[in-house]
């Protein structure tokens, strides 16, 4: 099962590497609104600095977002904001086969091949 998950994640990253720039550009316009609301969000990017918090592609909690063809992801979080998780779905929409990756609050986690997820504490 581990081999399958690692293989699936590798395929996911391969499939999204070309889609990331456009996805990040589309999300940049919403980042300030997310910060002003003090809402929880998770970030995925190629470069992540855990000290400065620099990263792009912020996304609301509990929303489904398509990245490239047949790849979707959804951000979830615990109510205490201690970690953020990205559920990666294979197929159209956030249904069917999926893999979950989590990252502790306010940290920068390398998930594979230079991609990172960074979760922020959710402010209730």
UniProtKB/Swiss-Prot annotation:
Top-level taxon: Eukaryota
Cleaved signal peptide residues: 1-19
A Pfam family of this chain: Yeast-kill-tox
Disulfide bridge map: 45-55, 48-108, 64-94, 85-102, 103-109
Keyword Disulfide bond assigned: yes
Positions of transmembrane segments: none
GO function terms (MF aspect): toxin activity
Subcellular location, record wording: Secreted
SUPFAM superfamilies, per database record: gamma-Crystallin-like
Main location: secreted
KW GTP-binding (keyword) present: no
Positions of the propeptide segment: 20-37
Key words, A-Z: Cleavage on pair of basic residues, Disulfide bond, Secreted, Signal, Toxin
Gene Ontology cellular-component terms listed: extracellular region
Function: This toxin kills sensitive strains of yeast.
Subunit annotation: Monomer.
Record's protein name: Killer toxin
Organism of derivation: Cyberlindnera saturnus (Yeast)
């Amino acid at each position: 099962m581990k081999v399958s998950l690692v293989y699936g994640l590798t395929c996911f990253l391969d499939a999204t590497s070309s889609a990331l720039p456009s996805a990040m550009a589309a999300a940049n316009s919403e980042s300030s609104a997310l910060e002003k609301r003090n809402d929880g969000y998770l970030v995925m990017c190629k470069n992540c600095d855990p000290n400065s918090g620099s990263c792009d592609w912020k996304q609301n909690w509990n929303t489904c977002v398509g990245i490239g063809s047949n790849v979707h992801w959804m951000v979830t979080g615990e109510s205490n904001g201690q970690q953020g998780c990205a559920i990666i779905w294979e197929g159209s929409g956030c249904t069917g086969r999926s893999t979950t990756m989590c990252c502790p609050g306010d940290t920068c986690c390398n998930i594979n091949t230079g991609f990172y997820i960074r979760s922020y504490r959710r402010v209730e």
